[in-house]
């Protein structure tokens, strides 16, 4: 992780402490009035700790880990992968948000591209951590620009947030859209072309 922060001398952000996570879940169950030793909840702290290790796996990955393989194919037209499933966790309430991401880029003048599946893996790197959708969108776009050095990038993310659906305003089905454009895709005509491809069904 970049710039790790020490927590009272007990570890650094970026280190997963499974036992500590179990204890925290147990304390949370007690705090809401449950009995963590009753049948049905006895193994819940361990299960939740293991689930969090998977759900937040992106904390222990870097974008370079998934974008290391590139190909110089001389391709200079837009590459776009649509409808990449997004599963993430709102950092404000620690409840899920889910939806899709559309990720496109115009390769560098050398024609350097990456595998299509790598774009989906890049989305996962940033989605599998405590997150907000706005930052998620920006991080995907900035990583592509930095690592692939394309002439342009567009990222559009559309998600439903459980923190709006199951609590608070309670509006299930409401979708949030965020976008980030970089380089040549800031050009109106090029951006419109990309958006028409994204919106086409």
Swiss-Prot record:
SUPFAM superfamilies: Tetrahydrobiopterin biosynthesis enzymes-like (SSF55620). Keywords: GTP-binding, Hydrolase, Metal-binding, Nucleotide-binding, One-carbon metabolism, Zinc. It comes from the Bacteria. One of its GO terms (molecular function) is GTP binding. One of its GO terms (biological process) is tetrahydrobiopterin biosynthetic process. It catalyses: GTP + H2O = 7,8-dihydroneopterin 3'-triphosphate + formate + H(+). This is GTP cyclohydrolase 1. It comes from Streptomyces coelicolor (strain ATCC BAA-471 / A3(2) / M145).
